[in-house]
Amino acid sequence: MFIYNITLKIDWSIENDWLQWMKEEHMPEVLATGCFEKSQLLRLIEVDETDGPTFAAQYTAANREAYDRFISNHAPDLRQKSFDKWGNRFVAFRSVMEVVH
Protein backbone atom coordinates (compact mmCIF):
# COMPACT_ATOMS: atom_id res chain seq x y z
CA MET A 1 0.00 0.00 0.00
CA PHE A 2 1.02 3.56 -0.63
CA ILE A 3 0.05 6.73 1.22
CA TYR A 4 -0.04 10.00 -0.67
CA ASN A 5 0.41 12.76 1.91
CA ILE A 6 -0.20 16.44 1.26
CA THR A 7 0.84 18.75 4.09
CA LEU A 8 -0.88 22.14 3.89
CA LYS A 9 -0.40 25.35 5.83
CA ILE A 10 -3.44 27.54 5.38
CA ASP A 11 -4.19 31.13 6.22
CA TRP A 12 -6.34 31.68 9.31
CA SER A 13 -8.81 33.67 7.21
CA ILE A 14 -9.90 30.59 5.24
CA GLU A 15 -9.77 27.90 7.92
CA ASN A 16 -13.49 27.16 8.32
CA ASP A 17 -14.36 27.46 4.63
CA TRP A 18 -11.31 25.43 3.63
CA LEU A 19 -12.12 22.63 6.08
CA GLN A 20 -15.68 22.43 4.79
CA TRP A 21 -14.44 22.40 1.19
CA MET A 22 -11.91 19.66 1.92
CA LYS A 23 -14.47 17.45 3.67
CA GLU A 24 -17.43 18.02 1.35
CA GLU A 25 -15.84 18.64 -2.04
CA HIS A 26 -12.13 18.09 -2.55
CA MET A 27 -11.48 14.85 -0.69
CA PRO A 28 -14.62 13.15 -2.09
CA GLU A 29 -13.53 14.26 -5.57
CA VAL A 30 -10.10 12.70 -5.06
CA LEU A 31 -11.69 9.44 -3.88
CA ALA A 32 -14.09 9.48 -6.83
CA THR A 33 -11.12 9.04 -9.18
CA GLY A 34 -11.01 5.40 -8.06
CA CYS A 35 -7.28 5.61 -7.39
CA PHE A 36 -7.50 5.58 -3.59
CA GLU A 37 -9.27 3.32 -1.12
CA LYS A 38 -9.59 5.76 1.77
CA SER A 39 -8.61 9.19 2.99
CA GLN A 40 -8.16 11.08 6.21
CA LEU A 41 -7.58 14.69 7.19
CA LEU A 42 -5.36 15.42 10.16
CA ARG A 43 -4.35 18.59 11.97
CA LEU A 44 -0.72 18.85 12.99
CA ILE A 45 -0.09 19.71 16.61
CA GLU A 46 2.95 21.20 18.31
CA VAL A 47 3.75 23.34 15.25
CA ASP A 48 3.96 27.11 14.90
CA GLU A 49 0.48 28.38 14.06
CA THR A 50 1.36 32.07 13.90
CA ASP A 51 0.51 32.25 10.19
CA GLY A 52 -2.21 29.60 10.28
CA PRO A 53 -2.93 25.96 11.06
CA THR A 54 -1.24 23.02 9.35
CA PHE A 55 -3.10 19.97 8.08
CA ALA A 56 -2.20 16.70 6.38
CA ALA A 57 -4.52 15.08 3.86
CA GLN A 58 -3.69 11.42 3.37
CA TYR A 59 -4.94 9.11 0.65
CA THR A 60 -4.29 5.36 0.63
CA ALA A 61 -3.68 3.56 -2.67
CA ALA A 62 -3.60 -0.22 -3.02
CA ASN A 63 -0.48 -0.12 -5.18
CA ARG A 64 2.00 2.14 -6.93
CA GLU A 65 0.12 1.89 -10.22
CA ALA A 66 -3.02 3.42 -8.68
CA TYR A 67 -0.98 6.31 -7.26
CA ASP A 68 0.81 6.85 -10.59
CA ARG A 69 -2.54 6.83 -12.41
CA PHE A 70 -3.81 9.55 -10.08
CA ILE A 71 -0.72 11.71 -10.57
CA SER A 72 -0.86 11.35 -14.36
CA ASN A 73 -4.59 11.60 -14.97
CA HIS A 74 -6.14 13.60 -12.14
CA ALA A 75 -3.66 15.55 -10.00
CA PRO A 76 -2.99 18.46 -12.38
CA ASP A 77 -6.67 19.44 -12.67
CA LEU A 78 -7.37 18.99 -8.96
CA ARG A 79 -4.33 21.07 -8.01
CA GLN A 80 -5.43 23.81 -10.38
CA LYS A 81 -8.90 23.84 -8.82
CA SER A 82 -7.28 24.36 -5.42
CA PHE A 83 -5.21 27.28 -6.66
CA ASP A 84 -8.19 28.79 -8.46
CA LYS A 85 -10.27 28.66 -5.28
CA TRP A 86 -7.71 29.60 -2.61
CA GLY A 87 -4.95 31.43 -4.48
CA ASN A 88 -1.89 32.13 -2.35
CA ARG A 89 -3.68 31.59 0.96
CA PHE A 90 -2.12 28.15 1.37
CA VAL A 91 1.14 26.34 0.74
CA ALA A 92 1.46 22.61 0.22
CA PHE A 93 4.12 19.98 -0.11
CA ARG A 94 3.61 16.39 -1.08
CA SER A 95 5.22 13.09 -0.17
CA VAL A 96 4.54 9.46 -0.97
CA MET A 97 5.13 6.68 1.52
CA GLU A 98 5.09 2.93 1.14
CA VAL A 99 3.57 0.96 4.00
CA VAL A 100 6.16 -1.61 5.11
CA HIS A 101 4.42 -3.03 8.20
Q: In which residue ranges do the predicted regions lie?
A:
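Short hydrophobic/aromatic patches at helix-to-coil boundaries
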Residues: 97-101
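Coil-to-beta-strand transition motifs
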Residues: 1-3, 34
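An amphipathic, aromatic/His-enriched active-site/gating alpha helix that lines ligand/cofactor pockets
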Residues: 33-37, 52, 60-96
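Short amphipathic alpha-helical segments
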Residues: 14-41, 78-80
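Short, well-ordered beta-strand segments in beta-rich or mixed alpha/beta enzyme
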Residues: 3-9, 41-72
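Short, low-complexity intrinsically disordered segments
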Residues: 10, 16-19, 65, 84
